[in-house]
Design a protein with these regions (language model features):
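Glycine-rich phosphate/pyrophosphate-binding loop regions near the starts of catalytic domains
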Residues: 26-185
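Glycine-/charge-enriched secondary-structure boundary and capping motifs
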Residues: 2-10, 118-136, 145, 149-152, ...
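Short, acidic (Asp/Glu-rich) active-site segment that either coordinates a divalent metal cofactor
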Residues: 166-215, 220, 224-225, 266
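N-terminal amphipathic/basic leader segments beginning at the initiator methionine
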Residues: 2-34
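Residue-level signature of catalytic and energy-coupling elements of molecular machines
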Residues: 13, 65, 176, 259, ...
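Short, acidic Gly/Pro/Ser/Thr-rich loop/turn segments
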Residues: 17, 67-70, 163-166, 187-189, ...
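Buried hydrophobic packing segments
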Residues: 20, 24, 91-92, 195-198, ...
Length: 354
């Protein structure tokens, strides 16, 4: 992926981040030999959304993520109850891309100074959203680390399970398959450094209190802080309605699932197209939310760059066999997830967004 100039100006070095991820992956790979021919042997995946361990008849799926600098917005507003949705979404929606049902999560909160009221709000929210997804909080860690961090850092690990014969790797995707887009009304937990930089540059240090220009953004009387804190949609349970929880029957022929996080659609959809001759034509994605259009305008961000930073209203893409399109949309609607046909898989070898 090319370097995104605006993101670099916001203090995010994409090139260094990619290089660091590559180094981390390299050393993680050196540990795989330790489980060779043993229970829990890792399955090597290229570009997957989570790790896979072989447990005989099923795979254990693991993944880690966090809420990133969305926490800073919560700290500005003094509102922490909805961040649990973001934490659950980041890890469970990665795992379900492989067809896995997440059964448990652990979380780690590092804080300059612990505050029992804030911890209570965070964990009460996390418990609420986990219970809705039928996920157990199996453990966690709270650490007061002084000036090692500025504010708080909240991350989680998810553990999921999927039958071997039911794992979704994207290798069965073919031209003519339909791409369904699931709507997202916020930024999820990605691209906040850029959004915050744009708003600070335009409105100063108290940007989160700004209201006047928001009539154009279609968000009523909300402040920019409230808008950015919009909780993520959690797709996990709805997607399980398509692929089935562990031991349940699969309702439709799902061939690939893409969680649209950092990198946007251009950076994430290719991860599930194992046949590099395949591409996609997306001519009916969900429209860009009005507030994101306003961010793009305020920051003078190129649309191409915006696509690689934010989800632009499309939080997940699901590739299904054409014959199962209508049934898929019906199941997603039943699970209260807004979904639409966004396009189709092609033989073009490229992602075309119209």
């Amino acid at each position: 992926m090319k370097k995104i100039k605006k993101y670099a100006l916001a203090g995010v070095n994409i090139e260094e981040g990619d290089a660091s991820s590559s180094i981390a992956g390299k050393f993680a790979g050196t540990t795989f030999a330790g489980r060779k021919n043993k229970i829990g042997e890792p399955v090597k995946l290229l570009g997957g959304f989570a790790g896979i361990l072989d447990f005989g008849k099923y795979y254990l799926v693991t993944g880690d993520d966090g809420v990133g600098t969305k926490m800073e917005v919560a700290e500005r507003l003094g509102k922490f109850d909805s961040l649990g949705a973001d934490l659950v979404a980041m890890v469970s929606d990665d795992a379900v891309c492989l067809g896995a049902e997440v059964v448990s999560m652990t979380n780690t909160l590092d804080a300059a100074k612990l505050d029992r009221k804030i911890v209570g709000e965070l964990l009460k929210g996390l418990a609420h959203f986990c219970l809705k997804q039928k996920i157990v909080i199996a453990g966690g860690e709270l650490a007061e680390v002084g000036d090692a961090v500025n504010g708080m850092v909240w991350n989680a690990t998810a553990i999921g399970i999927v039958a071997k014969k039911r794992v979704i790797l994207g290798d069965k995707i073919k031209a003519g398959d339909i791409v369904i887009a699931l709507r997202e009304n916020g930024l999820r937990s990605n691209g906040f450094s850029l959004a915050r930089k744009i708003l600070k540059d335009n409105f100063g240090k108290d940007w989160h209190k700004e209201k006047p220009a928001l009539a154009k953004a279609g968000v009523g009387n909300k402040t920019w802080g409230e808008i950015l804190l919009t909780p993520s949609e959690i797709y996990h349970a709805a997607v399980l309605g398509l692929v089935g929880r562990f031991g349940e029957k699969r309702s439709v022929d799902v061939r690939g699932i893409c969680h649209v996080t950092g990198g946007g659609i251009p950076g994430n959809l290719p991860r599930i197209l194992k046949n590099k001759k395949l591409g996609a034509k997306l001519d009916n994605l969900w429209p860009i939310p009005k507030f994101v259009e306003e961010l793009i305008r305020l920051g003078k961000v190129d649309l191409e760059d915006a696509r690689e930073v934010w989800n632009l209203g499309n939080g997940m893409l699901i590739v299904v066999a054409a014959k199962d399109t209508a049934r898929s949309l019906k199941i997603l609607a039943k699970n209260k997830i807004a979904a639409r046909i966004a396009g189709a898989i092609t033989n073009s070898g490229k992602i075309e967004i119209v």
